[in-house]
């Protein structure tokens, strides 16, 4: 059988099916197509398939929709089936004007387009290729139907007597699926409604009814209540509303006088009301607390700053209800914090937002500043720092100022997360052969995840490796990583050390060099602060030496004191040290007067005999002559002259005591002797010396102390000095100042050493005109 004969047979089947019912006609059409396709495949062997098939879809009633069907290279008839019923053959759907077959027929496109979907279009659809004997998967088309406009029974205005309950009923009909109803008042949902649904005869649409009960206390005059119905077909919903018309409670007006007012002044609140029926009660409250002493229209009170933010309310009541009205008082007061600013921890590059709220009256000014900076960052409640950097971290101050009233401030901290920052001394010091440390100080928020030391080919993060140990500690300021090197060698001073720290935001590196401690002092560059340990060692050694010398001097002084008990006169030797005290002398007449005065004082006391004094003067004169004839073996090296215009050179010659412990060639200096006020007493303003030193051996009340007292009261005849034989004592240079165990308060800062001349020259102040050096001759 040829193809055109099959097509003719198919048309016959179609015409025959027209005489039958729609359901039978569809079956006949399918059988006809299948028969035709079978013969065609037998004759031609062609196989077809769908490139597009209809899919399940949802459409809102009244909207167009298209069901896809495409069979490439197929030029035969396509049949659309709806719930098992054929809509027509090919593109001829004249029986259903709302349906169209669209698409390129040559490309095998046979799409079914519904121009305006209706509830009856809600069905299962299928695309069939008759000659190819294939059919598509069934596709479900769901048609959504929005509800009718909702209706509130009794609307649009519902009259209600105050105190009566309110029942509202709203229904929304003919929706698919059933609508949902909500009740609204002032934009807020009212809960507590009840619902009921009814399925309509078509089995697809539904109606819904909602009932809302409102108690009398929740109803206000002129209030609008909304009923809104929604379903999938209309998500925005449809709504209607009613207005409640009831007798209103009292209308209240509340006034405050005077305003503005300073704190601790009296104000008057007046509450006037209009009501029907008449007002039955006035009630006053502040911050929700009832004011018991107020019960009428007027309330008087003394206000403070709380009245500015805490309103006073007046509640007026009649038979239909109550009305409450509140007022604040314009009280002048200084700034008070209402919202505390909070410290922030932010990431580098992000924004930091601080909020700080104050209350004050009159209007206050808010100033945001960074602590330590005079720059105003903001005058608003909110301070926003855009793209913060690490240098933005610190303290920020929110300050509020009420003109002519007061000011207040709060401080917050901004912490910025960022890469570590290493701030360490690039040159650090250590001693050769000792243990040395290199410190790396790291500031990092968040704390560093890793810290590593590297030098040469070595890398060490923690623990010990050979001579190297790494320790890390955390402090409030940051993290300190210490590289400890034991038994430092020369090569360590030539090595470059690298300290690197990482955190989640990045890293930082510092190059540190190790320098030998004390190298600056050797090169003449001066001492550095790192040489303190050597200075401590030297100080300890010197202290030990001084202690030893003090002990030796005490022993020598004790021996000298015992040997002096048997001495009758003063014996002068060439080897004795001569201490020359250079000063200016007044006129010879004054010298004689002083000489006579001192001699008379000595005679009055009776402690020294006249001939012993004369003997001492003669001995001193002889020694002076011998000294003048003696050649200085040092060529004046130890002669320290301060002035050359002196009129005379008085010399004190001190004889030695036994035993003589000084080494050969060393100087001896007198001990147990005080120079206090000697020359100030004798010479007045014209003298050169004003020694404040007082040196006393630690031997209690001895003959040396008595000698000292008499020496201060004695005289110097003919510009010469004398000492009693019992006062003669000396200490070897090996004792130095160790022999002096007790000092006068005026001499603690400049105690005498073993060479009195050296001590005097070192401790004297050149700016003092009355103090000069002593000349010491060996």
Swiss-Prot record:
**Extracellular side of membrane:** 22-535
Q: Which domain of life is it from?
A: Eukaryota
One Pfam entry name = Ig_3
Q: Which residues lie on this side of the membrane: Cytoplasmic?
A: 557-778
Topology within the bilayer: Single-pass type I membrane protein
Record's InterPro entries? CD80_C2-set, Cell_adhesion_signaling, Ig-like_dom, Ig-like_dom_sf, Ig-like_fold, Ig_I-set, Ig_sub, Ig_sub2
| Keyword Ribosomal protein included in the entry's annotation | no
Q: Which residues form the Ig-like C2-type domain?
A: 48-142, 147-243, 249-330, 335-415, 419-515
Q: List the disulfide bonds.
A: 69-127, 170-227, 271-314, 356-398, 440-499
The entry's keywords = Cell membrane, Chromosomal rearrangement, Disease variant, Disulfide bond, Glycoprotein, Immunoglobulin domain, Membrane, Repeat, Secreted, Signal, Transmembrane, Transmembrane helix
One biological process GO term for this chain? principal sensory nucleus of trigeminal nerve development
Which positions, given as ranges, span the membrane?
536-556
Biased composition range(s): Polar residues? 727-736
What is known to happen upon mutating residue 731 to F? Answer: Found in a patient with intellectual disability; uncertain significance
Q: Which family does it belong to?
A: Belongs to the immunoglobulin superfamily.
Q: What does the subunit comment say? A: Homodimer; mediates homophilic interactions to promote cell adhesion. Interacts with NPHS1; forms heterodimers with NPHS1. Interacts with NPHS2/podocin (via the C-terminus). Interacts with CASK. Interacts (via extracellular region) with MAP1B. Interacts (via extracellular region) with MYO16. Interacts (via intracellular region) with ATP1B1. Interacts (via intracellular region) with SHMT2. Interacts (via intracellular region) with UFC1.
**Described function:** Synaptic adhesion molecule required for the formation of target-specific synapses. Required for formation of target-specific synapses at hippocampal mossy fiber synapses. Required for formation of mossy fiber filopodia, the synaptic structures connecting dentate granule and GABA neurons. Probably acts as a homophilic adhesion molecule that promotes trans-cellular interactions and stabilize mossy fiber filipodia contact and subsequent synapse formation. Required for the coalescence of vomeronasal sensory neuron axons.
Q: What is this protein called?
A: Kin of IRRE-like protein 3
Organism (species)? Homo sapiens (Human)
Please name the taxonomic classification of the source: Eukaryota, Metazoa, Chordata, Craniata, Vertebrata
């Amino acid at each position: 059988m040829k193809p055109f004969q099959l097509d003719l047979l198919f048309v016959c089947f179609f015409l025959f099916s027209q005489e039958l019912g729609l359901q039978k006609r569809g079956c006949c059409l399918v059988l006809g197509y299948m028969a035709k396709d079978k013969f065609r495949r037998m004759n031609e062997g062609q196989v077809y398939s769908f490139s597009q098939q209809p899919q399940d879809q949802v459409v809102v009633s009244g909207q167009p929709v298209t069901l896809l069907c495409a069979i490439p290279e197929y030029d035969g008839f396509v049949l659309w089936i709806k719930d098992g019923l054929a809509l027509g053959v090919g593109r001829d759907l004249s029986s259903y004007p709302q349906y169209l077959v669209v698409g390129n027929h040559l490309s095998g496109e046979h799409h079914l387009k519904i121009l305006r979907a209706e509830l009856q279009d809600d069905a299962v659809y299928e695309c069939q290729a008759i000659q190819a004997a294939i059919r598509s998967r069934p596709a479900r088309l769901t048609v959504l139907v929005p509800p009718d406009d909702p209706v509130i029974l009794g609307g649009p205005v519902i009259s209600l007597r105050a105190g009566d309950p309110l029942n509202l009923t709203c229904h929304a009909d003919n929706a698919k699926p059933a609508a949902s109803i909500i009740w609204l008042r002032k934009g807020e949902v009212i809960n507590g409604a009840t619902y009921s649904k009814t399925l309509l005869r078509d089995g697809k649409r539904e109606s819904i009814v909602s009932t809302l009960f409102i108690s009398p206390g929740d109803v206000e005059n002129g209030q609008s209540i909304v009923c809104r119905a929604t379903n999938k077909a209309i998500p925005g919903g449809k709504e209607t509303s009613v207005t409640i018309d009831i007798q209103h409670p009292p209308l209240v007006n509340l006034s405050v006088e005077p305003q503005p007012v300073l704190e601790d002044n009296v104000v008057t609140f007046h509450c006037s009301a209009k009501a029907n029926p008449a007002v039955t009660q006035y009630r006053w409250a502040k911050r929700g607390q009832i004011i018991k002493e107020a019960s009428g229209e007027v309330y008087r009170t003394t206000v403070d700053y709380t009245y500015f933010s805490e309103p006073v309310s007046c509640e007026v009541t009649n038979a239909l209800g109550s009305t409450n009205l509140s007022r604040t008082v314009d009280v002048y007061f200084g700034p008070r914090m209402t919202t505390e600013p909070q410290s922030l921890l932010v990431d580098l590059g992000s924004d930091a937002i601080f909020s700080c709220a104050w209350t004050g009256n009159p209007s206050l000014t808010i100033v945001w500043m960074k602590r330590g900076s005079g720059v105003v960052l903001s005058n608003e409640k909110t301070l926003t720092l855009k793209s913060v950097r690490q240098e933005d971290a610190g303290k920020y101050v929110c300050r509020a100022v009420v003109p002519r009233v007061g000011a207040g401030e709060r401080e917050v901290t901004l912490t910025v997360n960022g890469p570590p920052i290493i701030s360490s001394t690039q040159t650090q010091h250590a001693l050769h052969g000792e243990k040395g440390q290199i410190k790396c100080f790291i500031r990092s928020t968040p704390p560093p995840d890793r810290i590593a030391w590297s030098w040469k080919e070595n890398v060490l993060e923690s623990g010990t490796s050979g001579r190297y140990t790494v320790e890390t500690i955390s402090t409030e300021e940051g993290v300190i990583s210490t590289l400890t090197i034991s038994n430092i060698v020369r090569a360590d001073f030539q090595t470059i050390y690298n300290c690197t720290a990482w955190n989640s935001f990045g890293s930082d590196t510092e190059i540190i060099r190790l320098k030998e401690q004390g190298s600056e002092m050797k090169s003449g560059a001066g001492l550095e602060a790192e040489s303190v340990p050597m200075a401590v060692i030297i100080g300890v050694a010197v202290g030990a030496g001084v202690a030893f010398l003090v002990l030796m001097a005490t022993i020598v002084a004790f021996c000298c004191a015992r040997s002096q008990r048997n001495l009758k006169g003063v014996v002068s030797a060439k080897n004795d040290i001569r201490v020359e005290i250079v000063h200016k002398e007044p006129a010879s007449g004054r010298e004689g007067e002083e000489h006579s005065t001192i001699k008379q004082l000595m005679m009055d006391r009776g402690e020294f005999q006249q001939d012993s004094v004369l003997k001492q003067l003669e001995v001193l004169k002889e020694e002076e002559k011998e000294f003048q004839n003696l050649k200085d073996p040092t060529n004046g090296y130890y002669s320290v002259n301060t002035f050359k215009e002196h009129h005379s050179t008085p010399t004190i010659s001190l004889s030695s005591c036994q035993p003589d412990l000084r080494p050969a060639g060393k100087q001896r200096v007198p001990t147990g002797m005080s120079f206090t006020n000697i020359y100030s007493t004798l010479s007045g303003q014209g003298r050169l010396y004003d020694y404040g030193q007082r040196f006393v051996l630690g031997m209690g009340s001895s003959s040396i102390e008595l000698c000292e007292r008499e020496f201060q009261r004695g005289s110097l005849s003919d510009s010469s000095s004398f000492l009693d034989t019992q006062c003669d004592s000396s200490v070897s240079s090996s004792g130095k100042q160790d022999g002096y165990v007790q000092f006068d308060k005026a001499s603690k800062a400049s105690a005498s050493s073993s060479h009195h001349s050296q001590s005097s020259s070192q401790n004297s102040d050149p700016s003092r005109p009355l103090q000069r050096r002593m000349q010491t001759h060996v």
